[in-house]
Each structure stands twice: as C-alpha cells, then as structure tokens.
Amino acid sequence: MLLALAQWLQGDASFLRLFTYLTFRAVMATITALVIGLVCGPWVIRKLTQMKVGQAVRKDGPQTHLVKSGTPTMGGVLILIGIAVATLLWGDLTNRFIWIVMLVTFGFGVIGWVDDYRKVVYKDPRGMSSREKYFWQSVIGLFAAVYLAFSVSEANNVRVFDLFMAWVRSGLSMGLPARADLMLPFLKSISYPLGVWGFIALTYFVIVGASNAVNLTDGLDGLVIMPVVLVGASLGVFAYVMGSAVYSKYLLFPHIPGAGELLIFCSAMGGAGLAFLWYNTHPAQVFMGDVGALALGGALGTVAVIVRQEIVLFIMGGIFVAETLSVMLQVTWFKYTKKRYGEGRRIFKMAPLHHHFELSGWKETQVVVRFWIITLMLCLFGLSTLKLR
C-alpha cells in the first residue's frame, strides 16, 4: 500500500524513493508487526480471558502442565494481525506471491481457529477430527500447489494462465521450465525435473506437512515461535536472492521474478513472532493455538516452495521434522507391538519429542532453549547452501 503511494508521489517528494527499496520495507515490516504485537498483546489476552477460551490440557500429558489449564489460547490471532497489517502496509500488493502466501496462511488460520474453538467450547483437547482437518488443509494445499506449479514458472499471471492452458492442450503431459525443478543443496548444476504432477504432489506434501509439523511442535511455552522466526528469516534471505536477477545469477540460482517480495512477508512474520514470544515465554500468558501453528507452518511451506528450497526447509526445520517423526514412530511401534505381543510398547517416554525430554528430567525452559539453539545451527547450515554449491 505504502509502496504504491510512494511510487505515485515520489515525483513531488524524492525522499519517498526510500519506500521503493525492498530492504528498507522489510525492516519497516518487522518493526510494524513487532509494535502491533506488543501494543495489542495485552488487549488480545484480556479479550481471550473474558471469552474464557482457556487451554484444555491433556490429562495423559506431563503432570507439570496441569497448572497451564485455563491459560488463554487462540493467541495466534495476534500474530496473524501483525502479519496482515505489516504485509499490506509495506508489501507490493500487485505481487502474486504475496497473495498466495497470505491465502494459505489465513486459510490454515481459519482451520486452526475452528479447531481451537471446538476445543474451548466442548472442553475437548482433540478439537476437529483428523479427517476433517486434513480435508480442508488438502483443499487449500492443492489449490496453492496447482497455482504455484505454473506461477513459479512464469513472470506474471497472464503468462501463468497461458502456461496452464498449454498444459491442458498437451493432454496434461507437458513439463515445466527448469526454474520449477527440485533444487538439490550443494549442487550448482544439478536439479530434478518434477513435471506438473510431481510439482503438485511435492508442494502439497510440503505445505500440509509443514503446517502439521509446526502444530505438533507447539507444546511448550515459547518452543515453536522462535524456530518459526528463525526459519522464516532464513527463507526471507533465499527469497531476496531468488528474486534478484543479479544475486541469483551470481550465486547460480534460478531467477524467480517477484519472489523477492516475500522478504516483506517473512519480515512481518518475524516481527509478529517476536512480539508474540514476549507474552508466550515461560510462564506463558497466552498460547498460540492451532490458529497460529497451522497458519505459520503453512506459510513456511509455501514460501519454501516458491523459492524452490523444499529440501533446505527440511534441514532448517529439523526440529519440526524430529517432532513429527517421533509421533509417527511412537504410534506405529505401539500399534505393531500391540498386534504382535498383545501389549503396546513405546519408543519414547511420550511423544511428541519435547515431552520425552521433559520426562527424562529436562526442565521445560531447558528443552525450549536447546531446541532454539539447534534450530539456529540448522538455519546457519541451510544458509550456507547459498554459497557452498
């Protein structure tokens, strides 16, 4: 919004050219989202408390968590407000990637809001059924996947439609340009051509998978928000590089016109996330809820797909991956041993993984900070792939 205004008025006021610089707008988006979160936080927490949307704690979880029962949840709306305002103020609203990321983020946020609402109203920690949740996630994820398959490959929406029609006329067998290939970290001239169907399948898996992985990780005060901020900031760097014809050529990445604008979104997400951490740090005054976790995970997955860094997201989001795998392994092993031996056995003391460490004697704050440190190291490793190729 402010970019369009600056472009319109810069002939009358030369200082407004500052607003056309992507890095300046990214910094301002971070500050805007941070200030909005810090200022609106007490009001949002107070309203959530008045609405009596307290968190229902799992009875089979760690006993130390029982004191958290009744803490306001659905605080993810505070993050989404900060992201929305900062992105709309400082982003280029003609950029197609901004809108598709916003669509996925807020679409998944609505799913999470319904899930949280059911948990609060019916006092049931399970919320929406898994089938219902995955159905709506799949609807949004598949829509985004189909659009991005052609959007990443072309420079504007007109050419996106032309490419889509060419694919239809080919009998759904036409391939995609090289910039839509799966990029392999550390290899500068080797990529894997996915084709339209492969791109759609991978994108769906990344978006929906990232959303649920972040949601599973959100189990301790402050645990998930800092990794989201770190991974989001790192993806913002990739977006800046991929969106620049100069830097992408120098670093041997495919140039994706318009991708650089995602730096604004990632910056807004970082600022909003830090503001939320102010109130979510131990002992938490508010919980993110599914409305925040599902939305942020979907956002990370979508940005990673656009900048063609799905594998790097897997690396930098290693904590999310480990948490998800711990649940999958626990459930699979329990069912297998129950069928084979008549008694279910566990690999971990409790899943997701952060509960295993809690029951192993780690304090909650130790688990949280150590997971932050691991994520920081993984993000630095992921960023190293910019040059080590």
Swiss-Prot record:
Tell me which GO cellular component terms the UniProt record holds. plasma membrane
A single MF term (Gene Ontology): phospho-N-acetylmuramoyl-pentapeptide-transferase activity
Q: What is the annotated localization of this protein? A: Cell inner membrane
Instruction: List the Pfam families hit by this protein, alphabetically.
Output: Glycos_transf_4, MraY_sig1
Q: Name one GO biological process term.
A: cell wall organization
Q: What is its EC number?
A: 2.7.8.13
User: Record's PROSITE patterns?
Assistant: MRAY_1, MRAY_2
Tell me how this protein sits in the membrane.
Multi-pass membrane protein
**Family to which the UniProt record says this protein belongs:** Belongs to the glycosyltransferase 4 family. MraY subfamily.
Biological function: Catalyzes the initial step of the lipid cycle reactions in the biosynthesis of the cell wall peptidoglycan: transfers peptidoglycan precursor phospho-MurNAc-pentapeptide from UDP-MurNAc-pentapeptide onto the lipid carrier undecaprenyl phosphate, yielding undecaprenyl-pyrophosphoryl-MurNAc-pentapeptide, known as lipid I.
Q: Report what the protein is called.
A: Phospho-N-acetylmuramoyl-pentapeptide-transferase
Source organism per entry reads: Burkholderia mallei (strain ATCC 23344)
Organism lineage reads as: Bacteria, Pseudomonadati, Pseudomonadota, Betaproteobacteria, Burkholderiales
What gene codes for this chain?
A: mraY
